[in-house]
Amino acid sequence: MTTIDRARFATGLTYDEYKAQMTRNRDRLEANEARVQIDPDDLEAFRSLNGPIHVLALAEDWCGDVIANLPVLGKLAREAGTLDVRIFLRDQNKDLMQRYLNQGKYESIPVFAFFDDAFDEIGVFTERPTTVTERRAEQRRKLHAEHPEFGTYGAPADTLPEDVRARVYRK
């Protein structure tokens, strides 16, 4: 399994570098970033960390969960000043992705892995909060029950028509 060390971490993109290289969804990511409001108590908690905390993020610009969650991390890092974020493109860093497979088999992103200054891992966030996953699954079940023409419930969401996917994920 790949070990994360200071040298490997340093090869990742900064948040601004990641945004600059995006070829898709940059407007959506920046709109989400503009909407993010960090609670003052949360911001103070991050500012008071014995830092720095190094955050390795696995991301791709086509992923809706990345577009939703990465702006929160980017803004928090900028405002708190204690998070050192480096972003690695999942599809170009399969060795890192193998370390953080969701349920041991899925290449879910984003992944945010948190490390102390000795690069000992202290926590991992994968994809999205469980409550969001549950809510999305329920919405998809309802949608497929109401619209059998969209295929079976278990069909991948990317097979749905774009306007339908947008409706499902917006709710």
What are these regions (language model features)?
Residues D61, D91-N93:
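Short, solvent-exposed coil/turn elements at secondary-structure transition points
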Residues H54-E60:
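Short glycine-rich or small-residue beta-strand-to-loop segments that form or flank ligand, phosphate
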Residues D61-A68:
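Conserved redox-active cysteine motifs that mediate thiol-disulfide chemistry
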Residues M1-I53, G74-D84, R90, M97-S108, ...:
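Non-globular targeting/processing and membrane-anchoring segments
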